[in-house]
Amino acid sequence: MAVSGFEGFEKRLELRFFDDDKPITKNPMGLRLIDFESLDQVLNEVQCTVVSAVANRSFDAYVLSESSLFVYPTKIIIKTCGTTQLLKSIRPLIHLARNLGLTLRACRYSRGSFIFPKAQPFPYTSFKDEVIVVEESLPKSLCYRKASVMTPSNNPSRAWHVFTASADVESDEHVVVVEVCMTELDRVNARSFFKRKGDEKNNSDSAGKEMTRLSGIDNINANAYICDFAFDPCGYSMNGVDGDRYSTIHVTPEDGFSYASFECGLSLYDNGHEDISEVLSRAIDVFRPSDVSIATTYGGEDYNHEVTKRVERVLAKKLDLKCRSRLMDEFPGSGTVVYQSFTPRRK
């Protein structure tokens, strides 16, 4: 293991709002009306920038120098890796939303366990300190609050940290969010995310498209429009846009601290979309990692134990990954989180 390297594990923040004149009729664009200059100022505080972007009728998707930002009419998702100061975005985003007549309804902050925890700035050296900073940034109206550290017995160093706050005890979000964290990537597969000789002639967008094709990422969801970006000399990010559904992948391929993440939002009961277990199988197969963790957040959807078991069966059958730990916790106003840890059967 390297003494120091780039921190791949992301910090993730999700803010959900409601319109003071609900339903949203006067301002159907909602948060999407925030001008780019204002967003750029927020990202400057976080210590990252926009490197590529795409939009459709439902939302705006930005690839950042450190991960991704998604802006929906009443929801913002921002995840950043490295040593970024993600929590500095909370207050300015709430302020920008208030100027549009939107009031904060719920907040969720989550992250895995850092590979290089000592390299993180305050408050990210302690989850307890992070929770304090988040709580101080939120209005008192978000009174249903909970912090939890979900620690798998097979690998305590890969805990999942979650803090939620909501104005309502029942969740308003009928979307399931799946977050996959992968470490110790297959070395051959990881080579796809290094720029090759001659790539200096291409820009980062075209090099990113080549990485998308060579790695097989374009096969994970054939219906998605992919906005991708290749970093120099290595590393990769992409956002996928499919109707009102997003997906995102980030890769730190260096040996010794290799890491990749895959995230998507979906409905379990939408017949127009694929079985999540098959999607996860294809995403994980791109990287062939030695360690996989999957955090699934059931918002307004009821927790579905059969989906959890199906994911375990498919990953065992197709990728020879065995589920070593399965944890579950409930968060008022934010739903149920299931955290699964996998390693190859040979381990």
Curated annotation (Swiss-Prot):
Keyword Kinase among record annotations: no
GO molecular function, one term: adenosylmethionine decarboxylase activity
PTM entry text: Is synthesized initially as an inactive proenzyme. Formation of the active enzyme involves a self-maturation process in which the active site pyruvoyl group is generated from an internal serine residue via an autocatalytic post-translational modification. Two non-identical subunits are generated from the proenzyme in this reaction, and the pyruvate is formed at the N-terminus of the alpha chain, which is derived from the carboxyl end of the proenzyme.
Organism listed in the record: Arabidopsis thaliana (Mouse-ear cress)
Residues holding substrate: E66, E254
Protein name: S-adenosylmethionine decarboxylase proenzyme 4
Gene3D superfamilies: S-adenosylmethionine decarboxylase
Catalyses which reaction(s): S-adenosyl-L-methionine + H(+) = S-adenosyl 3-(methylsulfanyl)propylamine + CO2
Enzyme active site: E7, E10, S67 (schiff-base intermediate with substrate), C81 (proton donor), S237 (proton acceptor), H250 (proton acceptor)
Gene Ontology biological-process annotations: plant organ development; spermidine biosynthetic process; spermine biosynthetic process
Family annotation (InterPro entries): AdoMetDC-like, S-AdoMet_decarboxylase_euk, S-AdoMet_deCO2ase_core, S-AdoMet_deCO2ase_CS
Cofactors (names): pyruvate
Taxonomy, superkingdom: Eukaryota
Keywords: Decarboxylase, Lyase, Polyamine biosynthesis, Pyruvate, S-adenosyl-L-methionine, Schiff base, Spermidine biosynthesis, Zymogen
Induction, per UniProt: By auxin.
Function: Essential for biosynthesis of the polyamines spermidine and spermine. Essential for polyamine homeostasis, and normal plant embryogenesis, growth and development.
Annotated site, Cleavage (non-hydrolytic), chain positions: E66, S67
Cofactor annotation comment: Binds 1 pyruvoyl group covalently per subunit.
PTM-bearing positions, type Pyruvic acid (Ser): S67
Enzyme class: lyase
Gene knockout outcome: Reduction in the length of stem internodes. Increased thickness of veins in leaves and inflorescence stems. Altered morphology of xylem vessel elements. Altered homeostasis of polyamines. Hyposensitivity to auxin and hypersensitivity to cytokinin. The double mutants of bud2-1 and samdc1-1 are embryonic lethal.
Involved pathway(s): Amine and polyamine biosynthesis; S-adenosylmethioninamine biosynthesis; S-adenosylmethioninamine from S-adenosyl-L-methionine: step 1/1
EC number: 4.1.1.50
Family note: Belongs to the eukaryotic AdoMetDC family.
